[in-house]
Amino acid sequence: MKIGLASYECRMNDIGFNLKQIEKAIVESKDADLVCFGEAFLQGFAAVTSDYEMDIKMAVEQDSLPVAKIRELSLQYRKAVMVWYIEKDGPDIYSSYALIEGGSVIHNYRRISKNWKDYNITNGNYREGTDTSPFLFHGVEMTVALCGDLWIYPESFRCSGLLIWPVYVNFDLDESESGEYAKQAAMACGKALLVNPLSKEPISRGGAFFFENGKVKQSLGLDKEGVLVVEV
């Protein structure tokens, strides 16, 4: 299976632009079977204000129009897509990462660490998930960790197959820094794919990496849009 790690620009609270970027990346991913995007992609990293009345309006449900558009794209281009979104489920809000294939959401991971919002002021409707179980996709055992999850609870993501690690990093992922991420990923899984979006506000320089046994095996440069295709 070939997996494309799409490091593309996303904009805060501009879902229309971000959906166009998703389609652009899918087209440019060529023969990838699955295209993965970084944390904060659909609504933008700073979209969460920790003001419940604002955030519940910003969040989207699995059957919302934006998610329906991504489902349509997965059908149109015959590719699976993994994308981060702020999810609304009834009165509750989650930081989630959906796997979409064939027009359906087939897996929906909810971040388990709490530092995606200002937890000192948010109410009980800002929720974390509890399920970190691996799942099978095209015969490959996979698990998903969202950004800080893997730094706080690495033992919860142990997997014999492949770790998908979408992040939002606002500092340089240079050789030294990416090496630290590779070592951290190895605490959970021998093979890991990290993808970081590009953003002007707040700043994120992008980049994508394939880690194996704590080492960087493949990478995509910073400050430019592109898709790193990895065969697993």
Please tell me what each predicted stretch does.
Residues 1-5:
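Extreme N-terminal starter segment of soluble prokaryotic enzymes
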Residues 24-102, 171-187:
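Cys-nucleophile CN-hydrolase/nitrilase-fold catalytic domain and related Cys-dependent amidase chemistry
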Residues 59-80, 151-227:
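CN hydrolase (nitrilase-like) catalytic-core segments centered on the catalytic cysteine
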Residues 78-84, 111-120, 192-195:
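Short Pro/Gly-enriched beta-strand edge/turn motifs at strand-loop
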Residues 81-85, 95-99, 133, 206-210, ...:
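Short beta-strand scaffold segments in enzyme catalytic cores
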Residues 88-161, 175-178, 222:
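Active-site catalytic loop in hydrolytic enzyme cores
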